[in-house]
Amino acid sequence: MKIFFKNMMTLLACLMFLVCSGCGIKAESDKNKVAYSVTDVTGTVIEFSEKPKRIVSMGIGSDEILLELVEPERIAALTYLSDDAGISSVSIKAQVIKGRVQRNNLEAILSYAPDLVVVPDWDGIDFVGQLRSAGIKVYVHKTPNTMQ
């Protein structure tokens, strides 16, 4: 009887160990789960596990779109051109975003610790490569070139 009881306790301990370790593995895999992915104009697939929280925009067109579609708290910086009422349709809305960046200034962009940088397709591909090499997700968007 003592041997049976000892074997049952050992079996129960092994089962508890397996159950507890199985829970830990599942929780770890959920953390790295991809919620959605997007493909930019260069064909690069960008995967997101959650909505970006610190977006930097590198073009006035993307400034205008972001300010209309995204909560201001999720925008870390816009281009300095967004303040110019002569060329920006969102110069007043842009005032709530404090951060400003200029073209191809890697250090300034990195200082905002972005989780996404939105870049127009006319910007240099070398600069996009530098951003990606720094571990930043970069979405390159197509820029319209006609009114049609």
Task: Give, region by region, the residue ranges found by the protein language model.
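A short, structured surface patch at a secondary-structure boundary
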Residues: S57-Y112, L116-D121, F127
